[in-house]
Amino acid sequence: MEKKWWKESVVYQIYPKSFKDSNGDGVGDIRGIIQKLDYLKELGVNVLWISPMLESPQDDNGYDISDYRRIYEEYGTMEDYEELLCEAHKRSIRILMDLVVNHTSDEHNWFIESRKSKDNPYRDYYIWKDPVNGKEPNNWGGAFGGSAWEYDPQTQMYYLHLFSKKQPDLNWENEKVRQEVYDMMKFWCEKGIDGFRMDVISMISKDQRFPDGEMNNGLYGDFGPYSVHGPRVHEFLQEMNHEVLSKYDIMTVGETAGVTIEEAQKYAGEDRNELNMVFQFEHVESGCGDYGKWTTQKYDFKEFKNIMIKWQEKLQGKAWNSLFLGNHDQPRSVSRFGNDNPVYRETSAKMLATCIHMMQGTPYVYQGEELGMTNVYFDKLEDYRDIESINYFEEFTESGLMTPEHMMKCLMLRSRDNARTPMQWDAVSYTH
């Protein structure tokens, strides 16, 4: 396989809101990241993947972008970001931007215009459908609970949102949308970024029939077969590669939930002209129950081991592996795959790190993983901020699918908030 710098790198993911607060306002920021660049250099990090720092109402903690060319004010300014790029590059650290283009915020100007009227020039930037028998266009459920469709009284139509209702899906069938995305990507490449981590990129192509999904355990149909690895996804990515990616010496990794070995080879095959690598989630989904991640069921170690071996063997010489156990969407790896009892926490963390760093592929370290940070185990719903956790708690308990007590145990084990607590820079106890 061809030698590339990203094959020899160690990537460190920063969740900016909770990484380092430089001004005491309780929110992590860009200047805080700059302050810790020497620490990251000493740690052996070559690439920083930073979760979204662009303008956003923060409904989904920045994965709902309202302006693709502005920095979120609480994180800093464009000048701060440019300084971060400069200072990181001085230390031979590259910067990977989180690219969120399956959807925008409903407060993005494109959507504000789109919902005004059926003949607005931005109408087809999003996916609008008429009601069917006075109800949603199909039975799809959203990834964060509830229906994937939201009724808009202004034009008496529904718009699609595979995530929060404040995250309307872009219509990638529209060539103008794709060009807007490519122009924005070029803007950031010209700023000097070194690549993109592409959020839920496998969902940008939808089956244009929009059929009902299969009813699994739950209240809504599964959108997966019709919106994940859709009919034109590889065409779109090859176009993106031709228009943008091939013109820069950058690294790309796509978030591709549910990807198979065969699909991964399509996304990241060296002769495919799409992405450099993908995130597969088979290993972190090991042990999921009837309601997906919301379970107290433990993972099977042998199954986990076999999954890791399979991906190593099947991608050998065909595509490049991304190696990770945790990120901003996963519970803490020590709590999930090791033992976070104080007696075993450190040993578990070292064992898991050894596992990841000794395999072939590019390893990704999530902030705090190097310290063996653990789940937080909040036992009250009001302590949670994650929209996914809150929505599913309400949906599952109100429908009777789970008792509040059982669902709370699921949140304690699986909520995304477990990974989003403040980075533990010292041993000082925090009190309200």
Regions found by a protein language model. Give the residues of each.
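Active-site and adjacent substrate-binding regions of carbohydrate-active enzymes
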Residues: 1-430
